[in-house]
């Protein structure tokens, strides 16, 4: 059977596979486009298995927030090279996945996300198909989701740094829907998303710090040479003072606001000023931050 250019083009548009791959698949399938798709999928899955052992440390973090501003999501998708990370297919996959995560709280677990439906196929199979098409290992590594509690007014915003190297979600709680739309509140949300990106807090406020983390910090401080040997009451006073530095680094509202040119105002002061400006309570609901490649060991060039 003659394989026409139109048949090849249609199959390529449908699958994203290369011209020669489509032509060979159509020939093997005797011109049947549906069987040709199966041929490509089978080949893609085989290729994916061969690529799976490679280190995928590049890629991007995709971010999305709903038009209503009540939910947002982040997804980190890794590949092997920056070139692939900038391709339309790779970026498109990441953008579709992040919308899935926003719509489904359970999908923030990447194992659950792999089983979700995407264009009539399992996400895991879509990823494997793309591996076969692109020729690099691709890993959906992490996801995060942030939503306002049911019945709570506020907004969720996202911030992407350096073209997707870092992604941030930041949520604010307000007393009213009108307050959530106020210019000062929107500006605060965007500024705090930038703060989270730059200053890397671990908690919103000190009340969120787990007891075991605090105890470990106290043990570290108590073991320092200039603390040892002093009376217990003096040790406790010194340790408490130094814990304030820990809070100032680890807790968002205790951090120095990065947009303060004098470096004196804390984030809590900026939140209080915003409350005064809009005439109602405003507080931070939470945040999420993903940095591309955190914890992935990059293989040195040969």
Functional labels for PLM-detected ranges:
Residues 2-302:
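N-terminal assembly/interaction segments in proteins that build large macromolecular machines
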